[in-house]
Amino acid sequence: MIFLAAPTSTAERMEKIAALARGFIYCVSVTGVTGSRENIASGLEAFLAQIRSHTDLPLAVGFGIKSPETAGKAAAIADGVIVGSSLIERIEENLPLVKDEPERVINEVCAYFASLKKAMENTHFAMN
């Protein structure tokens, strides 16, 4: 089971998550609905530092990772980056092409992930 820690999590909850988690901790970068933000929360670095004070597990940031810019910013301070909603959006944008041009859809999604990967190069995440 992967545990989620949010910016609204109390210190007590973070301690409990750290004690029970295995593999990594999923750090929610924003409050609100997933995929609805354009920027990484300004307090994300402090939030990750607070969680790190309770665990040595890798911290993966998700929610709000919509662009190469946000992926790069998250990768600079986290051990992993999780992309969900924006992947679904890319697939949905290309749904009319799935039947007749499935390779084009795959290429569009791969190009999007390549742009995320490029943005994360030479960051803390890529160096570990």
Q: Model segments located where?
A:
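Glycine- and other small-residue-rich loops at beta-strand/loop junctions that grip anionic moieties
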Residues: 2-6, 36, 40, 63, ...
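Histidine/lysine/aspartate-rich catalytic loop segments that bind and position anionic ligands
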Residues: 3-35
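Catalytic cores of alpha/beta
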Residues: 9-18, 54-55, 61, 65-81
